[in-house]
Structures are given as C-alpha cells and as structure tokens.
C-alpha cells in the first residue's frame, strides 16, 4: 500500500513519541527532551534522546535514529504497515484504503529512480573520462578536494544534444522526459536538457538521486544560457519541498546543533570542503514554507548565511518575511552577514575556515535583522520618515500568527 508523505507527516504530528517509547523504555526528562540508556547498544551513561517537538529519537553513541514508525519496526520488530496501523489507531486516524493508481504512481517513481541513478553514473564517468578535462580544471580552480568531488558526485554532461539518449538507451523517450532529463518540443526532435555543464546530483532525504543541477562551463559561448540550470519539477522532485544536501547535513546538524542555509549548492559544497558539513541550500527559489519546516525538524534556529551583496540581503529578507507568520515558541531564524561582496567560498579562501566559524558562532537574531534592514532602507530625516519606518515594522509584526510572539515583537520593535 502506498501512503502519501502528507498522510504520514500528519500521523507523526499526532503521535507523542516519548509516550510510544516510554512504554518499553524508562525515560528521564532532560530540558525539552527525554533521555535514556540506548536500547540498541550496551551503555551505562545515557546517550539516547527523544525529542517530541521534532518527532525523532537519536542515540549519540551508536547513531540509531528514527521516528515513531521506525521505533516500532526496529525495536519491536513490527512490519511497516502494522506499525502504521497501530499508531493510526492511537491517533484516531483512518489508514487510507489501497489505491491502485497510487501503486502505479509508486511503480513509476521507482522506474524514474532507475533513470536518475543511471544518468548519475554516466555523468560521473564522463567527468573521469577524456571529455572531462574542462570541468576537472574548473573543480581544481575552485579548490575542491578529490574526496569532496567524489562525495558530492560531480559529473559532466557533454555538449552533444543526443549524448544522454544514446547512453541511456535502455529507457524510452517518455521516461527520460518524465525524469527531467530530456526536453520535448512540439514539431521538433527531443534533446538533452543538460549540455556542456558540470553536473551535481540532487538527493531526497533518503539519499536517492531525484534531480540534477548543472553549471555552465562556457558562458561566453552562450550568453543567453543560465549559469545554473536545475531539473524541472517531476514525480520525483519538487524544488519547493527539497533542500540540497539535507541527507548529508542532517546527521552533522544533530552532532553540532546547528543547520546553515546558504544560497546555492556550490556554497554548501564549499563549506563542506572546509569542514563545515551542516549546510543546505534551496534550489533556485526563495526559501519556502515547506523548506522552513524541514529546517525546523532538524534545529530550532537555522542560520541563514546568504551572500554579502544586495541580492543576498534581499534573499535573507524574503526568507524572514516568509518565516514571520510561521514563528512559534523556540522556532525562529538566525542570520549571519557576510562581508560586502563575499560569498562563503570567498570568505573561506580569503580568511580561512576560522573566519567563517567566527561569524557562525555569533549570528544576529531575526528581530535584530528585521530592525536593522528596515532602519537602513531609507533616511530618517523627518517625522514622516520615522512614521514610515514604524508602519513597515508594524506590517511585519502583524503578519506573525502566534499571539504571544506577535505581542513580544511589537513591544521590542515599536
């Protein structure tokens, strides 16, 4: 039976994880969490933590990690659907009836995963081959280590419009197009979407390749081509619900207690190359509500670290405006301001990873950033100017849905 991600998310939200785990494991309150000796390995000092707000447990000793469903399958040995049915009964939810169309969609998604996996293997092989000298030179100039290149799965898409079609001949044209690998234009022959680009795989939370991003290698030869090109939305990929590098950054964030949001995937890789592994990026769009919720499942106060130019600061303000209506107790954003004109890679190369760590250690609050951005937006030379500032701040405050947080922001800002 195929259950939708939305239904499963609702089940997790209605389930109090500590109550489920507490039936078979003695839990002790530890701040906002509960702790216990881990049931998955022998230990005397508790390193197993349960977080009801985020809906997961994690052991810092053996790395066991999961939600209520995973607990019932791993700790009690229940089959997946039996675990779901037990939790649904307790939550007062009805398990959806089997849907043949859902099964067909699941089968199609599995087939499309085969397409993206095959494409990724081909891209990586191209980078290592004779045609990969130009992208290899670019990666060398960027200072990416061989280990980073392998870990992040860099590849190369050649300029030939039919190269991928020939290489992935086991898949028909329809599947290649549905996976976002080919472009179909009425009255013309289909052609490869990614050509003469340095390629990066985009993964889902389980680490499966679901889409790609490509950086153009010869922008002067094609001035109209975008510098970066992502896969379109497909049955596998919804860019507004996906964060680049989340499957790698989430374990690192659990260790460090922080999650960093940068503008693009090359920024996330540059941070990882410098040893800062808990960085993610949206995919060509402003940070969405769904992405903010994804971040809050990992940490309570993700750190925005956008470029230190006007575009980067505007992107930060768009993210803040998107987050304000969603604010709730213990959930907010923090903001790091990079030096003017610099992105994370520039700062690391100029001043070293230590300079980046120093900035990340002292981020500004959302409230302070909001005040300073609006304060600098226009001069305050007259009573009218000051009234305009107050009106802009009040508009922001009024968008906050949580009454207590709205009242506190109003008191601080006005």
PLM region descriptions:
Residues 330-413:
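C-terminal or mid-to-C-terminal helical accessory/interaction module adjacent to the motor/catalytic core
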Residues 3, 30, 104-119, 158-298, ...:
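Phosphate-handling DNA/RNA-contact segment within nucleic-acid enzymes
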Residues 9, 76-91, 197-217, 345-350, ...:
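Structured, non-catalytic alpha/beta "coupling" segments that mediate domain-domain communication
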Residues 11-14, 102-113, 129-133, 154-161, ...:
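Conserved phosphate/pyrophosphate-binding and hydrolysis machinery centered on Walker-type P-loop NTPases
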Residues 76, 254, 285-340, 346-356, ...:
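Conserved catalytic cores of soluble enzyme domains
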Residues 6, 82-137:
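Conserved active-site segments centered on acidic
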Residues 38, 59, 72, 139, ...:
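Terminal peptide-recognition signature
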Residues 1-103, 165:
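N-terminal structured subdomain of primase-like DNA metabolism proteins
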């Amino acid at each position: 039976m195929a259950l939708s991600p939305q239904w499963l998310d609702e089940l997790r939200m209605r389930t109090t994880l500590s109550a489920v785990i507490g039936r078979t494991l003695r839990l002790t309150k530890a701040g906002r969490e509960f702790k216990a000796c881990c049931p998955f390995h022998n230990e005397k000092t508790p390193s197993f933590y349960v977080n009801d707000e985020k809906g997961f447990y994690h052991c810092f000793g053996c790395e066991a990690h999961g939600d209520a469903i995973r607990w019932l399958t791993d700790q009690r040995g229940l089959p997946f659907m039996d675990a779901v049915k037990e939790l649904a009964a307790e939550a007062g939810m009805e398990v959806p009836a089997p849907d043949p169309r859902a099964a067909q969609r699941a089968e199609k998604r599995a087939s499309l995963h085969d397409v993206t996996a095959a494409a990724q293997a081909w891209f990586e092989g191209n980078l290592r081959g004779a045609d990969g000298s130009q992208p290899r030179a670019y990666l060398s100039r960027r200072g990416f280590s061989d280990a980073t290149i392998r870990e992040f799965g860099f590849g190369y898409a050649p300029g030939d419009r039919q190269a991928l079609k020939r290489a992935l001949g086991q898949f028909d044209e329809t599947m290649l197009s549905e996976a976002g690998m080919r472009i179909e234009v009425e009255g013309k022959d289909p052609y490869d979407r990614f050509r003469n680009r340095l390629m990066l795989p985009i993964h889902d939370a389980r680490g499966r390749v679901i889409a790609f991003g490509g950086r153009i290698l010869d922008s002067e030869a094609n001035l109209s081509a975008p510098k970066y090109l992502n896969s379109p939305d497909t049955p596998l990929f919804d860019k507004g619900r996906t964060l680049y590098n989340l499957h790698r950054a989430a374990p690192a964030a659990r260790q460090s207690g922080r999650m960093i949001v940068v503008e693009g995937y090359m920024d996330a890789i540059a941070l990882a190359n410098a040893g800062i592994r808990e960085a993610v990026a949206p995919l060509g769009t402003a940070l969405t509500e769904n992405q903010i919720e994804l971040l809050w499942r990992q940490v309570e106060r993700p750190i925005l670290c956008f470029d230190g130019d006007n575009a980067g600061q505007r992107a930060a303000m768009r993210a803040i405006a998107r987050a304000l209506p969603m604010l709730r107790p213990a959930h907010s954003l923090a903001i790091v301001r990079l030096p003017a004109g610099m992105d994370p890679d520039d700062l690391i190369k100029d001043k070293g990873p230590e300079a980046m760590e120093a900035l990340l250690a002292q981020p500004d609050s959302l409230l302070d950033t909001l005040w300073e951005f609006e304060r600098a937006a226009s001069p305050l030379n007259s009573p009218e100017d000051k009234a305009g500032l107050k009106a802009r701040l009040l508009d922001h405050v009024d968008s906050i849905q949580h009454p207590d947080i709205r009242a506190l922001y109003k008191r601080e800002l006005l």
